[in-house]
Amino acid sequence: VILLLVPLLIGRLVADIIKKEYCMKPGFWYLSGFLTMLALYQIICVPMTLKEYSFSKLVICYSIILGILSAIALWKYAGAILIWVKEKMQWINIFRGHSFFFYMALVLILGQIITLVCFMPDYAYCADDNTYITMANDTDETDMIIKVDSLTGHELSIDEVSLKYKLTSFITFMAYLARITGLHSLVIGKTILPVIIIGMAYYIQWMIGGLLFPDSRYKSEIFLFVISIVNLFMAFSNYTQTFRLMVCPWQGKAIMAVIVLPFLFYVGNKVFCEKFTIGEMILLMVTMFAAASASLMSLGIAPVMLLAIAFLNAIQKHRFMILLQAGICCVPAAIYLGMYVISILTTFGGW
């Protein structure tokens, strides 16, 4: 429920705020809902981490917020969602009317998911299992938010915890999922999340294909097929996007690389091509919060990508107000980047 129904419901609320045709699809609802969940968790988690609240309090606060939003969405859209399920979610209709390349892409994507879930759980990538998985499990078991040394098991003071853990939240988001579901963090990270993340990553690529070929679904399906083929051969280095997708999608850097940045590319090119609405600005700011939850790298990469897209569209359309609006959308990343810089200066500058 927490990873299937809740993102769909929250994303439906987001789509109602935006009120644009491109966001009125269940796949978009799920993506925007999942990113909104990450954004809300980031907003709540970082202050509670710095104030050294217990993990149980974080779980309660976050769950209440998700419960309220889900209840509102159910109250407003339950009837419409049920009608959509009856009309569109019949297996015979889902796979009807697509090209051969679409079916082949589905086979390849399913094969990648099965390979990762069934044959990769025993693979420990360097020391990242000791940090991501162990820290998530320690947070869940000790009820202290990232205050346990993953190598020694000793309790740390908040000043001893690395900034990249204090200012991001995806590790403890895995701990939250483990607490809510009753599953071990290892199962969440290496069995549950890969299915969700790989599915979302390829759906975004399909949307980008539609963006590149707006008049031909056939070409967008070929694009999806080509991407699924290329990914089979691109995990040769831990610096490739495919490596994050195919080997360790449960890491924050993977969320940034295969979910947040491609989604930002798609939405940025959508919103800057037409009249920019307040709802779309909110969506972009939510995406920035989600980026901040994943990795400190995203505090620089995500704003640069958004501003580059805005700059190109501003030149093409001679509407330079786009740059100001894009800059406002980058404020969430600027907040956490400012916190990072101040912490560094305070630590090493003697302030």
Walk through the language-model features, giving the residues of each:
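Perimembrane helix-loop-helix junctions
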Residues: 302-327
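Membrane-interface alpha helices of multi-pass inner-membrane proteins
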Residues: 280-296
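Transmembrane signal-anchor helices characteristic of membrane glycosylation enzymes that use polyprenol
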Residues: 99-127, 228, 329-343
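Transmembrane-helix signature of membrane-embedded glycosylation machinery that interfaces
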Residues: 14, 18, 47, 205-215, ...
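Membrane-interfacial loop-to-transmembrane alpha-helix junctions, especially the N-terminal start
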Residues: 20-37, 101-102, 218-224, 277-284, ...
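Active-site lumenal/periplasmic loops and adjacent helix-entry segments of GT-C-fold
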Residues: 111-231, 242-250, 259
